[in-house]
Amino acid sequence: MKTLVVALGGNALLQRGEALTAENQYRNIASAVPALARLARSYRLAIVHGNGPQVGLLALQNLAWKEVEPYPLDVLVAESQGMIGYMLAQSLSAQPQMPHVTTVLTRIEVSPDDPAFLQPEKFIGPVYQPEEQEALEATYGWQMKRDGKYLRRVVASPQPRKILDSEAIELLLKEGHVVICSGGGGVPVTEDGAGSEAVIDKDLAAALLAEQINADGLVILTDADAVYENWGTPQQRAIRHATPDELAPFAKADGSMGPKVTAVSGYVRSRGKPAWIGALSRIEETLAGEAGTCISL
């Protein structure tokens, strides 16, 4: 049986602008898990998920309690792994004919000298109106940036260098478990074991995981059903197949597609195996080449 790493887009957990309630997340997860359950019957499946809204909520709750010093961001990322991993595991385990589902708290090494620490640009937390920027920055000391028509907090997002728990993940996969891991891009730690005040991009973490466990494929699921040429124009066209070199211009694109293209291209170049970008609702069609974008050499 082949091994597949699947990175879930944020819409699998929470729709943009939705309240960060457990009820909303369970409802979105319930829509996502049937397709994942079908995949789990055909592949050894490792599932990576984002945590941007959730870790931002934890940070807000953390700041609201004035009696103790706020917990660092790496601890909050670990908390979000437990929260989201539990919700996904509960929902997946309820599907018929599911193998055992296991959530692994995953640490990922980053460099303390990564230039990302000097230029935070990873969005976390809920969306705000632009007119709230000055008050939020003054109250919390946050850095804020535009995310579409909204405003969101940004934090450092260093490059993942090594998944410290990959051997355990690989062992569980070989034993037939569906493994939820590297949640929120993994808990960022430095070589000396210290936690790091950052959030790693989950797509880059998924690509690194696929490399380290020698997966047979990497799937990055997103709101868009493919990578598009001339996006947002009357001439837009879905790209069904491309090489990493052909997709290189898209890696520099603004928005969320750039890191996804960077992630899949790096994996394909490193391992020579295929990767896909597509919509969760069409994941089986994407793997069959009937939807999404397939990236290969």
From Swiss-Prot:
Short name of any one Pfam family annotated for the protein: AA_kinase
Swiss-Prot/TrEMBL keywords: ATP-binding, Cytoplasm, Kinase, Nucleotide-binding, Transferase
InterPro entries referenced in this protein's UniProt entry, alphabetically: AceGlu_kinase-like_sf (IPR036393), Asp/Glu/Uridylate_kinase (IPR001048), Carb_kinase (IPR003964)
Compartments where located: Cytoplasm
Keyword Metal-binding: no
Pathway: Nitrogen metabolism; (S)-allantoin degradation
EC number per UniProt: 2.7.2.2
Enzyme class, broadest EC rank: transferase
Top-level taxon: Bacteria
BP GO annotations: arginine deiminase pathway
This protein's record includes keyword Cell wall biogenesis/degradation: no
Family that this chain belongs to: Belongs to the carbamate kinase family.
Protein name: Carbamate kinase
Organism, scientific name: Escherichia coli O6:H1 (strain CFT073 / ATCC 700928 / UPEC)
Gene that specifies this protein: allK
